[in-house]
From Swiss-Prot:
This is Threonine--tRNA ligase. SMART domains: tRNA_SAD (SM00863). It comes from Borrelia garinii subsp. bavariensis (strain ATCC BAA-2496 / DSM 23469 / PBi). Belongs to the class-II aminoacyl-tRNA synthetase family. One of its GO terms (cellular component) is cytoplasm. The keyword Heme does not apply. It is found in: Cytoplasm. The keyword Cell inner membrane does not apply.
Length: 582
């Protein structure tokens, strides 16, 4: 559901209203608390407070009980338009509200909402009265720190999160889903499965891939390169830093500097770690002259970029400061645009299917009020994007005015096994950089023209994609992506020669296999490797050795007894080749 549609939804109004109820309950229980903001969000709501004394999650139950008492009053939510002077008087003891009021656009009206004994600076919307909210359908879910206005230089506030649904059944369903999400948290599984780590003492937001995780990442990247080569892309490698003139020309220093690392002074010049790969690809293009006969260029790179994300925004692999972007840029003529866009969309759908994502949603962002490029190019580009989405029957919503100033775009979102949407692929026209860097090609009539430039990311950040895969599969990667695909577990030492034969046969065929001939008990080994999410355990006893067979136990506890060795190898190789998900 889009943001605009959500605002009209009854749940949005209920969640907005319950946030006010929570703020009143907090102020009742903790006098002298200062209130900040409390909006509805996806799946719930929050409110930020400055407490005189810190609170803990132990206080949440008391707050919930007080909220239910307030809800029982059935009080109305009443909107009132007030003047600037009235607002300053009403909230004179609330410094965060005063800060908001002083930054208001005075051309807009100032509105407040009154409910029970609480008044808040608010645009709404809300439910008519508290009877519309089921007192058994909400729960406070946690406490976190949040800087006022998201600025680390400001006061750290206490944010209380909650969730609210239409009824108790919906709430229970959501809370069960939250528990499953916690179990699958990539940070938790990353540690348990020895996939990656983050070392705050070395640098927050920087990912260290361990051997297990590095193997999986290498498999992802190898597949990425192979498929890009098949689809007519040339692979590029570019530096991690560039001089300031490059970022000045691209516009990053004017519009993106807050998200860039500080400059590095060296050789009497200023350098910056790259936040994006685009200017480097353009530099390669501009090393020579190009004819219309040379185009299109499809250039792709797994390029590491660095972005100065705020500490509070960092979240494991999902939000990092150093990550590898699967960038591509297509440089083409006007007549090639339609085919190139359709091919990018087809390629994106194909790539996602190979990783087990078959449910896609798209958001088409149109021209904002301020933009570069002429109207005809914008209109043509939007038409092409719409046509491509229709041809591939991808459902989409239009984000009116949501395009970047330099061109329209499609954002593709995948839906994971927990029914969460993740924005991954972007297909973005750029009318800005070709102009800034004076990109040209010689057209059929011998004149110099600007090429069209399309930015394209499929997987987005490799690190983020890795984290999504961990949670999507709960750590149980498909066979083709598992760092170890099978483990041989001999029943006793008598079958040692045969287990070595099996090990060598599978290893030489390219299967990632391990032989465990330790003294641990067989059942303990099976439990260990199931916990490690290894797809197959080959159980070999004397009968299997005599008949040259194996028995297979899967990580989901399925049993296949006495399968012929060559048949087992053939089946596994087929699953790997076809990149089967199950």
């Amino acid at each position: 559901m889009s943001k605009d549609l959500y605002k009209e939804d009854i749940l949005y109004k209920k969640r907005h209203s319950i946030a006010h109820v929570m703020a009143e309950a907090v102020c009742d229980l903790f006098p002298n608390t200062k209130i900040a903001i409390g909006p509805p969000i996806k799946d719930g709501f929050y409110y930020d407070f400055e407490f005189k004394n810190p609170i803990t999650e132990d206080s949440l139950l008391d707050i919930e009980n007080r909220m239910r008492e307030i809800l029982k009053t059935g009080s109305s939510f009443e909107k009132e338009i007030i003047s600037l002077e009235q607002a300053l008087e009403i909230f004179k003891d609330e410094p965060y509200k005063i800060d908001l009021i002083k930054n208001f656009d005075l051309q807009n009206e100032i509105s407040i909402y009154k409910s029970h004994n609480f008044i808040d600076l608010c645009r709404g919307p809300h439910v008519d009265n508290m009877n519309k909210i089921d007192p058994k359908a909400f729960k406070l879910t946690g406490i976190a720190g949040a800087y006022w206005r998201g600025n680390e230089k400001n006061t750290m506030l206490t944010r209380i999160y909650g969730t609210l649904w239409n009824n108790e059944k919906e709430l229970r369903s959501y809370l069960n889903l939250r528990e499953e999400i916690k179990k699958r948290d990539h940070r938790k599984l990353g540690k348990e499965l020895d996939l990656f780590s983050i070392h705050e003492e070395i640098g927050p937001g920087l990912i260290f891939f361990h051997p297990n995780g590095a193997k999986i990442r290498a498999l992802i990247e190898d597949f990425w390169r192979e498929e890009h080569s098949k689809n007519g892309y040339d692979i590029l490698f570019t530096p991690h830093v560039g001089k300031s003139w490059l970022w000045q020309t691209s516009g990053h220093l004017n519009f993106y500097k807050d998200s860039m690392f500080e400059k590095i002074e060296m050789d009497k010049s200023d350098y910056y770690l790259k936040p994006m790969n685009c200017p480097f690809h353009i530099a390669i293009y501009n090393t020579g002259k190009h004819s219309y006969r040379d185009l299109p260029f499809r250039w792709a790179e797994l390029g590491t970029v660095y972005r100065y994300e705020k500490i509070g925004a960092l979240h494991g692999m999902m939000r990092a400061r150093g990550f590898t972007q699967d960038d591509a840029h297509i440089i083409c003529t006007h007549s090639q645009v339609v085919d190139e866009i359709k091919e990018v969309l087809r390629f994106a759908i194909y790539m996602w299917s190979k990783f087990g994502f078959n449910s896609l949603k798209a958001y088409l962002s149109t021209k904002p009020d301020k933009s570069v490029g002429n109207n005809s190019d914008w209109e043509m580009s939007l038409k092409v994007l719409k046509e491509a989405l229709s041809d591939f029957e991808v459902p989409y919503e239009i984000d009116k005015g949501g395009g970047a100033f330099y061109g329209p775009k499609i954002d593709l979102k995948i839906v994971d096994s927990l029914e969460r949407e993740w924005q991954m692929s972007t297909i973005q026209f750029d009318f800005n950089l070709p102009e800034r860097f004076n990109m040209t090609y010689t057209s059929e009539d011998g004149k110099e023209k600007r090429p069209f430039m399309i930015h394209r990311a499929l997987l987005g950040s490799i690190e983020r994609f890795f984290g999504i895969l961990v949670e999507h599969y709960g750590g149980a990667f498909p066979l083709w992506l598992s760092h170890v695909q099978a483990v041989i577990i001999p029943v006793n030492n008598i079958v040692e020669d045969y287990t070595i034969k099996v090990f060598n046969k599978f290893k030489n065929a390219g299967i990632r296999i391990k032989l465990d001939n330790s003294s641990s008990r067989m059942n303990a080994k099976i439990r260990e490797y199931q916990a490690k999410k290894i797809p197959y355990m080959f159980i070999i006893g004397e009968r299997e050795a005599i008949e040259e067979r194996i028995s297979i136990r899967t990580r989901t506890n399925e049993q296949i007894n006495g399968i012929e060795l060559d048949e087992a190898l053939k089946l596994i190789l087929l699953k790997v080749r076809d990149k089967e998900i199950s």
